[in-house]
Amino acid sequence: MDEPTSMYTDPDTGARKELKLCRLSLIDPAALHDLGSVAGYGATKYGDNNWTGGYPWSHSVDALYRHLLSWQQGRNLDDESGLPHLAHAAWHCLALLAYQQHDACLLYTSDAADERSSV
C-alpha cells in the first residue's frame, strides 16, 4: 500500500527503518478527537455506520459547505451538536473520500449519474 520514501538509520544504534509516505503520527490528536466526536454524534443521531448504507453524496457536499460557511461567518461551534463546524466539514470530506476510494460514487447517489458534474 505505502511505498517506502526513505530509509532512517538510528544514530545511536544503527538500526534501520523504512519510512513511508503515510505518517498518521503527524495528524493533530485534538483535531482527530473532534473528528471522532462528530462520528460519535452522528452514530448517536443516525445509528452506527449509518452513512455506509448510502445516500446521495451531494448531501455530504451540502453539509460540508454549510459547516464551512458557518465557520467563515465566525461561528466556531455547531448549535445542535456543540462540536466544531470544521470537524463536521472534515467528517463530510472523509465520507466523500471513503465513497471515492470504494468506487461508491455511483452507488451512493440518488440516480445512476455521477453528481459531481452538477456541483
Name these PLM-found stretches.
Residues M1-V38:
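Basic/polar, acidic-poor N-terminal "presequence/leader" segments
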Residues M1-S6, L64-S70, D78, Y99-Q100, ...:
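Low-complexity, charged, repeat-rich alpha-helical/coil interaction segments
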Residues S117-S118:
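Serine residues within intrinsically disordered or low-complexity segments
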Residues Y108-A113:
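Conserved small/polar residues in nucleotide/adenosyl-binding loops
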Residues D79-L107:
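Short, compact, well-ordered microdomains
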Residues R23-D79, H85:
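Short, contiguous, well-structured surface segments enriched in hydrophobic/aromatic residues
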